[in-house]
Amino acid sequence: RVNYSLLKRYIFEFSAREDGSSKFPSNQRWGFFPSGSIGWRLSEEPWMKATRGWLDNFKIRANAGALGNGTVAAYAFLTTMGMKKTTAVFDGTLQNKVSDPSVVPDNLTWEKVATYDIGLDADFLKSRLSFSGDYYVRNTTDLYINGPEIPATFGDSTPKGNYGALQTKGWELTLSWRDQFKMGGKDFTYSIKGSL
């Protein structure tokens, strides 16, 4: 992770991770997931000096990042066969048989979640009043789900694989008030917070 702040006004951050899992075939075992953000504290700009009596902080920001999800069945990329009992009786016992090979998905890989967010933060009146707002878009690709329907003549069910995609988007708003006063000679702190 790398952080950099210039003049306490311009903020940059970059981070990256590389995850590995034995649940995937060797050519898909590792996933690289970067993220980055930028921020601008307008309240620290010289031309905002007139607001410093009531505006403590005003920042706009944007970030983008990717994460990987490796929550899949262990070794789902390998063909397996199992033993099970048959209805055939030989020498007074039910006989075992080897089941048909399992069907495996092609190119099983990580689910990938890419998130994009823009927002602002503001603190007023000696940081007693705070506001935060965000708008985000989240794209999930290579979603690990059941495969498409196939004809019954295939003789087996479709394996789970990276067949899906999903997008969610929305906004979040938070407003809070925090203050303290004397009660019985002691400081009493209270806060009120609301979110949408």
Task: Name what the model sees in each region.
Residues 1-196:
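Extracellular/periplasmic, surface-exposed regions of secreted and cell-surface proteins
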